[in-house]
Amino acid sequence: PCRSRGLGDVYKRQGEIQVTYFAAGEKVGAFDSFDEVASGNSQAYIGADYYWKGKHPGWAPFTAIPFGLTAGEIDAWVKYAGGQELWDELAGSFGLKNFAMGNTGVQMGGWFNKEINSAEDLQGLKMRIPGLGGDVLAKLGGSPISVPGGQIYENLVSGAIDATEWVGPYNDYFMKFYEAAKYYYYPGMH
């Protein structure tokens, strides 16, 4: 997320853990934090695992499952039904250890520069949507585009993308998407 500084060097001093945070782009690019930590150059990142599904498709379900488990159900699966063990196995194969750090809950469908009335309206739509939600959009004829959070607004304004999902009204307000796109839809595909 753009307001949470996602990459940190952690070190121990006098029995305390101190963390130095770097926002996306300060040390590495927004989509480079996984490799930065997996390589040992940094000790932790905060991010959504669906961004790493290109490295292994197993990452995506730990963030969102379109029209599947709710955020609370994913949390319960991770904590009580074997999800953490699967996550540990997957992350371990990359030299990582993952922890649930919270979630944003049910998300909106997103901001669109054109009206959507049917699935046909998604044909050719360039939308910033990661993870399995992007796979759903592609199956419906749209084009999922990867754009870091801090670049979404400018991409909407320039027309590089036609639509974006982010989080929900509160978070989206601070991103000022209402200035860049006319239509706001619910529910989300992720």
How does the language model describe each region?
Residues 1-7, 11:
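Single conserved hydrophobic/aromatic residue that forms the stacking wall/gate
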